[in-house]
From Swiss-Prot:
Binding site residues for ATP: 481-488, 1130-1137
Effect the entry attributes to changing R1035W: In ped3-2; Normal germination, but impaired seedling, roots and leaves growth
Organism: Arabidopsis thaliana
Protein name as it appears in the record: ABC transporter D family member 1
Membrane topology qualifier: Multi-pass membrane protein
A GO molecular function held by the record: ATP hydrolysis activity
Highest taxon, organism lineage: Eukaryota
């Protein structure tokens, strides 16, 4: 019989081809149409009649998104997802990507198509050559075999090159997709303060940084992989359908299509909603990651509160929710995988065997009786097998694409929702401005005017009603009122952060947001990451400066705010995270320096000098006034009345009043204040108290009738600081850089369980499944050889029995393979749990989380490492485990089988090749570990910039810093893309050699061994039985040797995998080593501290030294006894908070002796211990009740309440007693209205940091002090955003409770509450201790 590959060269072949031209075209068309039908079936099924029109992919991204949102602009995206569902978002994103790819993207896509087509053609030629090789080996024709093996080696190398190239192009496409989507998201996200509105006003999207930094790259990667796989499937389907029709009947294509479509339909009926599951998983991942980012942001405040245990409970609960959902997803993947594998993979393989063999039993491919004819048949079977298997794989790939599309749609929905909401919010400002400008809603002027303006919070609370006020240029307005009365909210409306519900606003500039004519200095200082010069010109960049800021100008600006020493402390071009480096007062002064640089017409000062001294505050006010800038000031300091001529008083209930200053009289009389509005609520009473305080202050200032009511007397001072003396070393956690093998050993010590626990059983099950899979692989290899033998002998009955056995093996394989994947993923999840718990055990103990971010020396992004890096490491580890166990078992088994067939020579060849290949790959492999570690670090930096943006969104929005932040984020993103592209290039070059050595070249060795076996085979070659045995042996030998080399190839590939894995191991265990060091040093650090006194707090020759080895206070000695409070004063940056850090054990006591009460939170509540209220307010997650009892849980607080106020009550009564006590505390801090604001009352849960003003948050901090009722309360400027009267009331309440204060403050009003003053002179080690004596006149 003529050779199948030479069929077209024969007369018969030409006749067959000529007679089947139409059928070939028809078959190819059927394959293409069938594949397309399979691919798109899920899309058709998921459409709804009310779906909006989709984009055609030809417009730019703005037009595309316009079409998306035009039909239903205000319909919430979440509602559309529930109703529309399906793949609409995926279609939209695909259209955007196609329209925005550009020439480079189109080139990459065309290059991928060309690569796929070329690879398919090469694979077809390789299949032919391997058929010829089988025939040459069977006939023992060595010269012909050598020529063919040379061609085979060349084709294999070309195939490796194309394989690596396709992976490179796919990776490049993934990066391009990510770049396009990120650019489009950023274009709207940073426009018109969308980054603020999306989280603080709109509320539809939570954790946008998770979608930008996690969902987008995963979507891009999976989409590019899908494109590659489907392009390959379509190309293979068309080519091999044509080849099949060229020598066989088109009926085989119909059979394949019928089976694949039927199996695909059955699978879709069983398929879970993987898109929704994936979307929820990403949401839970985002929530879990957000808690770690939140811990990083508020690490110092949490350390002061001792809130580790409470924060750990929140983190553990979120992690538990994530793990529970992932377990559910893994279970769904497991049972569905068994169904899918059985129908498409293993039963499909049996059907393929029938289709492969059928023409050789009854068709025209049936062999003749000659040896040459049987040799031709073996060659034909080899090629025919490749054709049928390739067709099945192609159509099977298209069939399961619906599942992959479903998974992709989960990412696409979240990304599309973010894009649509961002565009909607960014467009609101433009459209509303254009629409309302004609109604004179917003206009340009040289003054600021509010006319019948109503201020309403995003939650619907009315703060100010019908405000009418005009501020002319040259006039200065002071706004007063209790915390939460709407002072800052008024400017959120003025700045466009909140929508203008009703009324009329006139202001300078164009647009609803703030601009260069109106400069805002916010309540919460914001320091951008960058140089010192960047801080001064913020939000401008160097290229945007109209007048270049010279070095002399920088010095002048810094001198104005007493910060010129920063020029000596930091290099001019050094990028610094100033928010971590500077104290709150220094940050506020730098904010004022920005104001002096920009010189606007109007300046809005929102309590922006609360952390500086009164003298400095007055100096700033005079400087601004002299600069010709009109001030609109929010402040609680009555001393600023002198610098303003208009006062607006808000009462928090919607009421307001305006008072104008007269030069010949005081601001207001008491009678005038009382007549402003009748006081019928607590909030309005608070407003009246504030107004009286300002009026009284004005009268005192005007008459100067009161002299200073206290005097101080020096008690002790610091010794003369000798700068030549070497300072004691700040004992930072010491970590030695351990070698990678040591870190691997430490990791295995954490991960390897005992055999008796659940994970040990999983490892044992994995081993059993791997052995079972190897045995089944051997049976399949034997079955393949037997199949060839029966065909050669034309034993149809035996072949039918063999098919039944094949079906049984398919059933077993369809259980084993998915179960192995499931257990591998379970191991990854279990290891993630183990490593997470191991790290958290130290991370959330003894303030280690604080030390990581503030005392580690080098940047350790613990939040990134504990989440994304750890997840990737455990997934890679589980893959590495099965990648080690399976090839090891295969090598042992198939080496033994190979020895039986080829003897020791074949085994020697196998092992020699393996050793040489491993040595070669080790020599040429780049350092993938360091490269992968750097990539993860860059990913972490990019995500951190987005998280930081979300944290400081309001301050950035007030500054108008969206463009500046976008530039910084884009810079980090470009660095990430550049590194990823460089890593792709290195993987491409290495991938060619890796694939050739581990995958392709071993096939050639297999053919060589087959020839050797055939040459040595004994027996009468003329007998059919002998030929059958030889054919069986050659086929079985090929399978055995191939399995052996595949196993060795997997072993060789482990080197690259481990190199990539080493980067993750180093990052995780660098953190682990630092945490261990931070725990081991706790005892030694505090050897000089004695926690043995409940009534005394004393410093005895204690040096206060920063982690940067800067001396703040030398030989500090002072004693605070119960009832004698201490006031700590000094300029910003002099070390006030540093003293408290040492007192709280956040910083170690370097030398000297520190005696203090217990810091155990559980010992508080009965007048014992010490409690800290930090400078930066911290609102925890949870209910209103949780805010007051923090860091206790509700159960712990109820037990304390029951113990202190009752005896033996039930838990229900204890709860009511606790709530009653907490209500009294809220009344003391004037926040009882929070109970009425939300229908949830005590159980109301919201984002308290966004809902409450800074002053309200500070009063909540004092409420915590009242609840815990310690003997000593350490208060670090924690009331500077409250009014003077409220501050004095808070201190009176605390004093009446018996609390002794250690206070840091700039406010003279607090002096009467203290008996001692610790004055830190200059931040260079000098201090004075003075007694405070009250005097009367």
């Amino acid at each position: 019989m003529p050779s199948l590959q030479l069929l077209q060269l024969t007369e018969r072949g030409r006749g067959l081809v000529a007679s089947r031209r139409k059928s070939i075209l028809l078959a190819a068309g059927i394959v293409a149409a069938g594949g397309t039908a399979v691919y798109l079936k899920s899309r058709v099924a998921s459409r709804r009649p009310d779906s909006s029109r989709l984009c055609n992919g030809q417009s730019d991204d703005d037009e595309t998104l316009e079409k998306l949102t035009a039909t239903d602009q205000n319909a919430k995206i979440t509602t559309k997802k529930k109703k529309g569902g399906g793949l609409k978002s995926l279609q939209v994103l695909t259209a955007i990507l196609l329209s925005q790819m550009g020439k480079m993207g189109a080139r990459d896509l065309l290059a991928l198509v060309a690569t796929v087509v070329f690879r398919t053609a090469l694979s077809n030629r390789l299949a032919k050559v391997q058929g010829f090789l089988f025939r040459a080996a069977f006939l023992r024709r060595a010269p012909l075999f050598l020529r063919l093996i040379s061609e085979n080696i060349m084709l294999c190398f070309m195939l490796s090159t194309l394989h690596s190239t396709s992976k490179y192009i796919t990776g490049a496409l993934s990066l391009r997709f990510r770049k396009i989507l990120t650019k489009i998201i950023h274009s709207h996200y940073f426009e018109n303060m969308v980054y603020y509105k999306i989280s603080h006003v709109d509320g539809r999207i939570t954790h946008p940084e998770q979608r930008i930094a996690s969902d987008v790259p995963r979507f891009s990667s999976e989409l590019s992989d899908l494109i590659l796989d489907d392009l390959t499937a379509v190309t293979d389907g068309i080519l091999y359908a044509w080849r099949l029709c060229s020598y066989a009947s088109p009926k085989y294509i119909f059979w394949i299509l019928a089976y694949v479509l039927g199996a695909g339909t059955a699978i879709r009926n069983f398929s879970p909603s993987f898109g929704k599951l994936m979307s929820k998983e990403q949401q839970l991942e985002g929530e879990y990651r957000q808690l770690h980012s939140r811990l990083r942001t508020h690490s110092e405040s949490i350390a002061f509160y001792g809130g580790e245990t409470r924060e750990e409970s929140h983190i553990q609960q979120k992690f538990k929710n994530l793990v529970s959902h992932m377990s559910h997803v893994l279970h769904d993947h497991w049972w569905f995988g068994m169904i899918q594998d059985f129908l498409l993979k293993y039963l499909g393989a049996t059907v393929a065997v029938i289709l492969i063999i059928e023409p050789f039993f009854s068709g025209h491919l049936r062999p003749d009786d000659s040896t040459l004819g049987r040799a031709e048949m073996l060659s034909n079977i080899r090629y025919h097998t490749s054709v049928i298997i390739s067709l099945f794989q192609a159509l099977g790939t298209l069939s399961i694409s619906s599942r992959r599309l479903n998974r992709l749609s989960g990412y696409a929905d979240r990304i599309h929702e973010l894009m649509a909401v961002s565009r909607e919010l960014s467009g609101d400002d433009k459209s509303s401005f254009q629409r309302n400008r004609s109604r004179n809603y917003l206009s340009e002027a040289n003054y600021v005017e509010f006319s019948d303006v109503k201020v309403v919070t995003p939650t619907g609370n009315v703060l100010v009603e019908d405000l009418t006020l005009r501020v002319e240029q040259g006039s200065n307005l002071l706004i007063t009122g209790p915390n939460g009365s709407g002072k800052s909210s008024l400017f959120r409306v003025l700045g466009g952060l909140w929508p203008l519900v009703s009324g009329h606003i006139v202001k300078p500039g164009v647009g609803s947001d703030l601009n260069k004519e109106i400069f805002y200095v916010p309540q919460r200082p914001y320091m951008a990451v960058g140089t010192l010069r960047d801080q001064l010109i913020y939000p401008l960049t160097s290229g945007q400066e109209s007048e270049l800021l010279t070095e002399i100008g920088m010095v002048e600006l810094l001198k104005n705010v007493d910060l010129e020493y920063l020029l000596d402390r930091y290099q001019p071009e050094k990028e610094v995270n100033w928010g971590d480096e500077l104290s709150l007062g220094e940050q506020q002064r730098l904010g004022m320096a920005r104001l002096f640089y920009h010189k606007p017409k109007f300046a809005i000062l929102d309590e922006c000098t609360s952390a500086v001294t009164t003298d400095m505050e007055e100096r700033f006010a005079a400087k601004v006034r002299a600069m010709g800038t009109s001030c609109i000031t929010i402040s609680h300091r009555p001393a600023l009345v002198a610098f303003h001529d208009v006062v607006l008083s808000l009462d928090g209930e919607g009421g307001w009043s305006v008072h104008y200053k007269r030069d010949d009289s005081a601001l207001l009389t008491d009678a005038e204040i009382d007549s402003v509005k009748s006081s019928d609520t607590d909030r309005q009473n608070d407003a009246m108290v504030v107004q009286r305080a300002f009026a009284a202050a004005r009268k005192e200032s005007a008459t100067n009738s009161k002299a200073q009511s206290y005097q101080t007397q020096l008690i002790a001072r610091s010794p003369v600081v000798d700068k030549s003396v070497v300072l004691p070393r700040f004992p930072q956690p010491q970590t030695s850089q351990r070698a990678l093998p040591s870190r691997v050993a430490a990791m295995l010590n954490v991960l390897i369980p005992t055999i008796f626990d659940k994970q040990g059983a999983q490892l044992l099950a994995v081993a059993c499944l791997v052995v079972s899979r190897t045995l089944i692989s051997d049976r399949i290899a034997s079955l393949n050889g037997t199949t060839v033998k029966y065909v050669l002998e034309q034993d149809k009955a035996a072949f039918v029995r063999l098919i039944g056995l094949s079906v049984l093996q398919s059933g077993a394989s369809s259980i084993i393979a998915p179960s192995l994947r499931h257990l591998t993923q379970r191991l990854a999840l279990g290891w993630r749990i183990r490593l997470t718990q191991h790290l958290l055990r130290n991370y959330l103990r003894n303030n280690a989380f604080y030390k990581v971010f503030h005392m580690s020396g080098n940047s350790i992004d613990a939040d990134q490492r504990l989440t994304r890096d750890l997840e990737k490491l455990t997934a890679d580890l589980s893959g590495l485990l099965t990648g080690m166990v399976k090839p090891s078992v295969d090598i042992l088994w198939f080496t033994w089988r190979m020895k039986l067939l080829t003897g020791q020579r074949g085994v020697a060849i196998l092992y020699t090749y393996m050793l040489l290949g491993l040595g070669f790959l080790r020599r040429v492999a780049p350092d993938f570990g360091d490269l992968a570690g750097e990539e993860q670090q860059l990913e972490g930096k990019f995500r951190f910039m987005h998280e930081r943006l979300n944290t400081h969104a309001e301050s950035i929005a007030f500054f108008g810093g969206g463009a500046r932040e976008k530039a910084m984020v884009d810079k980090k993103f470009r660095a990430l893309l550049d590194h990823s592209l460089m890593l792709l290039r290195k993987k491409w070059l290495y991938g060619i050699l890796d694939d050739f050595v581990t995958k392709q070249l071993p096939n050639n060795v297999t053919w060589g061994l087959s020839l050797l076996y055939a040459l040595e085979h004994k027996g009468d070659r003329a007998l059919v039985s002998t030929q059958g045995e030889l054919a069986h042996a050659l086929r079985y030998l090929a399978s055995v040797v191939s399995q052996s080399f595949m196993a060795f190839g997997d072993i060789l590939e482990l080197h690259k995998k481990f190199l990539e894995l080493s980067g993750g191991i180093n990052r995780i265990f660098e953190l682990d080593e630092f945490l261990d060091a931070s725990q081991s040093g706790v005892t030694s650090e505090n050897q000089t501290s004695r926690l043995d006194s409940q009534d005394l707090l004393s410093f005895s020759e204690v040096d206060i030294i920063t982690p940067a080895q800067k001396l703040m206070a030398s030989k500090l000695s002072c004693e605070i006894v119960s009832g004698k409070s201490l006031l700590v004063t000094g300029p910003n940056g002099s070390g006030k908070t540093s003293v408290f850090r040492v007192l709280r054990d956040i910083w170690p006591t370097v030398c000297g002796r520190l005696t203090k009460p217990s810091l155990d939170i559980k010992e508080l509540g009965s007048g014992n211990g010490m409690f800290f209220v930090p400078q930066r307010p911290y609102t925890c997650l949870g209910t209103l009740r949780d805010q007051i009892i923090y860091p206790l849980s509700k159960e712990e607080a109820e037990k304390r309440a029951a113990k202190l106020y009752t005896s033996g009550e039930s838990s229900t009564e204890a709860g009511s007693i606790l709530d009653s006590h907490l209500k009294t505390i809220l009344e003391n801090v004037r926040l009882v209205y929070l109970l009425e604001r939300d229908v949830g009352g005590w159980d109301a849960t919201t984002n308290w940091e966004d809902i409450l003003s800074l002053g309200e948050q500070q009063r909540l901090g004092m409420a915590r002090l009242f609840f815990h009722r310690p003997k000593f309360g350490v208060l670090d400027e924690c009331t500077n955003a409250t009014s003077v009267d409220v501050e004095e009331q808070l201190y009176r309440v605390a004093r009446d409770m018996g609390v002794t204060f250690i206070t840091s403050s700039q406010r003279p009003a607090l002096i009467p509450f203290h008996s001692l003053e610790l004055r830190l002179i200059d931040g260079e080690g000098n201090w004075e201790l003075r007694s405070i004596e009250q005097t009367t006149e």
